[in-house]
Swiss-Prot record:
This is Male determiner protein Mdmd(III). Disruption phenotype: Complete sex reversal to fertile females because flies exclusively express the female splice variants of transformer (tra) and doublesex (dsx). Residues 1-51, 80-109, 136-259, 840-1045, 1096-1133 are annotated as: Disordered. The gene is Mdmd. Component of the spliceosome C complex. Belongs to the CWC22 family. Residues 36-47, 93-102 have a biased composition (Polar residues).
Amino acid sequence: MNATDAESRKPENKPSSESSSSGSTSGSSDGEVSSKTYFKNNKSKVLSGQREVVLEVVRDLSYTICKEAEEKLVERFPRKDGSNEMLPKEDSINTNHNYTTDSNEHPVELTTKTEECKNTEKTKKKSFVRALSKDKQLSAYRSRSRSTRLSYSGHISRTHSVEKSLSRYKKSVLRNRRTSFGHGRDSSTTKRSVSRDKDNRLRRRIGSSRSHTRSHSRFRRSEKKLPSRSPRRIRSQERRHERRRSMSSDYERIALRRSEPIKRRDKDEFFKNNKKVSGDIKKGKGNDNGTVAELEAKITERQRKSLDILTSRTGGACLTPDKLRMIQAEITDKSSAAYQSIAREALKKYIHGYINKVNVDSVAVITRKLLKDNIVRGRGVLCHSIIQAQATSPTFTHVYAAMVAIINSKFPNIGELLLKRLVIQFKRAFGCNDKTVCLTSSHFIAHLVNQRVAHEILALEILTLLIESPTDDNVEVAITFLKECGMKLTEVSSDRVGGIFELLKNILHQGKLDKRVQYMIKVLFQVRRDGFKDHQSIIESLELVEEYAQFTHLLLLEDVTYPKDILNEFKFDDQYETNEEKYKALSKDILGSHASDSDGSFGSGSNSETALSDCDKVKNEVNDKYTSGDIIDETKPNLIALRRTIYLTLNSCLDYEECAQKLMKTQLKTCQQNEFCQILLDCCAEQRTYEKFYGLLTHRICKMNKSFIEPFKEIFKDICQTTHCLDTNRLRNISKFFAHLLFTDAISWDVLDCIKLTEDEAITSRCIFIKSFFQELVEYMGLYHFNKKLKTEVLAGTLAGLFPKDNPRNIRFSINFFTSIGLGGITNELCQLLKIAPKSAPSSSSSSSLSSELSAPSDDDSSSDSENKKKHKGKNKKMTKKKNPSKKKEKTKKFVGKNKIAAKNKTIKRRTDKDNSSSKDNFLKSESSSNESISLDSLSSELFAPSSYSSSESSNDSESKEKHKGKNKKMTKKKNPSNKKEKTKKKLSKNKKAPNKNTKKRMTEKDISSSESSISESKSLNCSASNQNENEKRKKRVTSKSRTKRVKMFKQCQWVDADNQRDIKRKKRAEYRYEPLVYRKRNEECLKKGAPNCXKDNYGNRQNHEISQRHDSEIKRRREERKKRHHEKNHSREYKRSKLGLCQREYFLYMCCQFYYPCTFQCLCQNCHFTFYS
């Protein structure tokens, strides 16, 4: 250092040297004489050594000191080259005799000087910080006062610092000896002696300082307590004071290090002057906000101070809440950094608050509130808070995953960022063997795979990574991961999941893992067998995003490297206002125009005015489309927004009453009501099963506002016409929905007039709709009340399509349809109509003919008779051509009569004249029964001409006798008495196989004669007579059936032989299985030993007992009897079914209809066309 530099710095450092010497040079001691003489001789050598000691002490300090302070400390001591700068004068040494015991040695003075220099340096730094803010001035003042208070503790540690300085001085001397090559032995000895003298002198003075009981210094109490304290305690106290001293200025140090403008001020000396700071900011230097210099010129000094506080690392956290609010209220410029930092802090608080409130029921509401705020700007904070919340509460992982799925469907970059951070977190935890972090992160990734946010490849990569190195922790993490997303992976890629389970099976068979982990693997296999029923991929209440609307990210473990942690920090935005406006427009498109509502409801009053564009506006836009060259958006974004808002409210509300109140707040226009009703119906149809919530909601809405009734009616009519466009699940949900509306009278029953149930218009989809619709109504109302409702006069016209009365074919179809769905009781009136319908046509024609005949005059009787005969002949010819059912029945009667005559030869041979007379009587009865159908001419001829009557009677008798005789002769020729028994047996077996034929064959002789006579006269009978004869014959068949049953029972009793029954019972008693177990075992043991059997007969004699076995012949006989019975039953059913022309399914329906509704039946099968009239 040059002398000029030292002289230039002398006046600047006068006050510091005076202040430092004021506390230390207050007295003198006796040990100073030897030091004087020593300094006179070897001043330069000693001071150069002291200079090195001081430099080492300064460099080893825990805090840093600038170069100026170091030079000031070393000014008194010369360098090694021997230049004596600022040496202490002899006069000053001689005059100052009143040194105290503590200030006799120069190293001690130097330590105090270093502390004082340190304090002065800190004060300079505090003065620099004082220019920034008043709060920094206060903190600097407090730290300065603390430093002055704690400087007293430096005197306590003097002894310890002296010892340190001695040891360092010795080391420096040795170093100088090694480096000095040119000096001889004398120089080394002088140095050694100097060091010894120095050590001795210092030890002497330390001892003398301890021996003194009283000192002249200001700090007596601290010196008195010195001997009682250990050096370790003193060191800890010093460290504590240093910590307290540094705590006050931590924030300022960080700000000095990290803020670029403040670094610039440190370099530039111009900023050290407090008066020129405001002027420089106006010029554009140190512009913290990064805005234009003109805007910064308008900022006041107070605003600048608040800006420095808010843009610091703490963000104003060290201020009181009132002061922070005042500062925030003063800032109104949105382009400033202070305003942006305040807005960012508010956004962070909102995000943390909403995420902490999430649960299963409130996911939709909270995501909607999150989307209102600018989450694109705060995406880093959002991802960080979600990951942190999931780590603290892993039980809500599926809820957070559902929320991320909703956000990812609208902002895929946020979902990708969160997934990347989770993957990086998992990789770091896997590398550090952190099991807890691995479990939480893998759990979250599994649920994101379930929600289709992450691809399945990522899950498979994680599983393979964990199972490749099978430790206890890795296998446990893999098991928990598989439990959560196993169902989804088996659905998507079952083969790869099967390979992973095979690897787990091999690990289990090796047996190297812990027993607990082995048991977990077994449990996992059991869960897989059960189909993951306790670990579903997605709960129904959290399935909020459709599969087509979701964006799936394909990430790999190796590709993800950078988590983008910079997004968590504040960053100034030059275009803050424009970006915020863009996001508001985007949120309106996503959430609808009610995104600004704070309560999450659907708006009310003025807010609902911007819900959708009015119909008039839309029309004007369409009209002006071709006139103006502007592009019109016809994608209907407002309509999509309305659908989204309604869907979110339906999923967020707890009950239908709350939902109805929220939906009614929208105050929709008339053109929007149809769309609103359609959205409700679509939401109901999309459910897996019908939910009563939608029916109750629509009923409440229709009662609150009756303008919604007409749109629902129109929708019902449209659905009835377009049922073929819907699948079965939607049809069932919609039909049950409208059934609920009709039951609650939310809409009128006049809607049913659009349904027409005919064979021509019948479609399977429409039949399914009507079936589920009517079955749901019957469940609500009951069959009795429902039938009563349908029979009211008001609904007579509306139900004409469902219950037609114009055509028998349509009547029959409606009856068959409702009976097939289990609602045949509704169609009683139609059944009665169907009975009357075929009889109405012939009866009217006959009545007209009768009236015409009665009105004719008596003179034209002959002509009318001839004309009537011709008419009858023509009618008979037409009947034969058309093959009426009456003629078929007559033919069957002929066939039946022939069979019965052949079966009863004996009775036919033994006929007497009495039988002939009885046949005449029967003929007369049949004629009397058919009087109504015979014409008036035939009746008059029979009544008023007895001769003709007798002649006709005799002729009829003769003809019948001749016929019977001819038939009897033929039967006697063909049939011998020897073959009678065999043929009768065959006939009995045939009768068993075909009981329907038997019932027709078993008729009395009187019936046979009457049937023959009716055949001869059937040409002259009408349909009404044949129907009456059928009714009479039906009654006779019932009596014949009861008679045949009795005969069968009697014959069965005769067939059974009593002796055979006794034999069978005896054999059963003697069988092996009825013998007691004890006797059986005893007999077997005796036979093994060779002894005779122990069984005895009735007289007490022993005899060998043979084990009886069942005879094969008896077993065969029973089997054959069982087969016969079974064959007879089946044959009778098949015969009846084949005769009726029904399939097997419809035969069962036929029997049911005969039991419940014995009126009509029509087969619905495509193959068979059969109509049955009872």
